[in-house]
Amino acid sequence: MSEDIEEQVLQQSCDSLLFALRLDESTDISGQAQLLIFIRIVYNEDIVDNLLCCKTLSETTKGEDIFEIVNNYLKFANLPCDKCIGVCTDGSPAITGSVKGFTSFTKKKNENIIFTHCFLHRRSPYDKNISRGFKKSFGSSCENSDNSKLLFHSAIRWLSRGRVLSRFYDLSEEIIVFLTIEESKYKFLRDEKWWTKVSFLTDIFEHLNKLNTSVQGCNENILTSTDKIMAFNEKLTLWKTQVDQKKLTMFPRTAERDVYARLVSLISESIMLLKDKMTKYFPSVNVDDYDWVRNPFSVSVNEVIGLRFSEEDNLISLKNDRTLNLKFNEMTVNKFWIYAQAEFPEISIKAITILLPFSTLYLREQGFSAVTTIISKKRERLRSVEEDSEDSRTCPPPDTMDVPPPKGTIFPRTKNK
């Protein structure tokens, strides 16, 4: 059945005019390096994501090794490298190295591929730039803990796991009672000022977590993700103004506690540090240049930049097509441009190349969760990760018409007409 699913995915991918890849290498709980490759294609009048393959890195995890696996699989799948318009990665040295990284080898095959750094995996600017007072509180909560690295990793890299901190804070009363009974030496955990600092950390990481989850999903693209990052940056400016006025509505847990003057100053300083580093880690994309992609009927073609003459000509014709204008209001942006491709191919393909690339590795996180389950000690049978990962694909169900019935199946009798 997994072979049937793989065959469907490969056929759909080959039929797509263009495709984008998303890949990442990580080590599973057995210590084995796994490479997940996802593909985004145009299929069934929409843009869809799918797991292309999961490959084990048997020896080293160098950029050249990753390139060889990707390149060989694309050859096996009959997917021309020149049809790939973008690759989204987590920005690890093996991927981004200018000489021996995956990107350098790939550029030799197709210099037009656009590489993007996953929005979710840009290291949180909050970990290294948090005010010293908060960093001390955050660090002491992880001290002497076997899971300290997991907690930091959770809050910094995979922010959806930031719930760990929320759970810790919400159990503060129970923790204090337990430590009192046990006569614990960690006296700072009974310090109200310390818990007030933790309350702010919990609130700010919750905001970061919401931002993180908002840029996930199959309908996300670079434009929508950029919108949300820009909105968050503007909110930080608003929050600092409110904090300077001693208004903490945006930090509900902090607002419930006795906030002293020094803490207000620390919060204000931390928000500014976060804003500065957000600007550094998430460079501004001039999304205004792509308003024609979001709504081609509301822009002046003379103001659109970056288009060739033939594309501008196509856009003018499309903009004045009343039938398409009505269709636009009935469809998603992705479906609209795929629909318009038949009549206006040049401008439609230009739009699709902007919408198609991945902006996040959210499926990567789901994929490695599946891999963890596959190799769990609870499994009572031996099967390779690659085989099992085929069954974890999110594509349409396998073609069961070609699957033989189980042995011993009894078919009902039918009367002859």
Model-based region annotation:
Residues 1-417:
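Alpha-helical structural modules in large enzymes and assemblies
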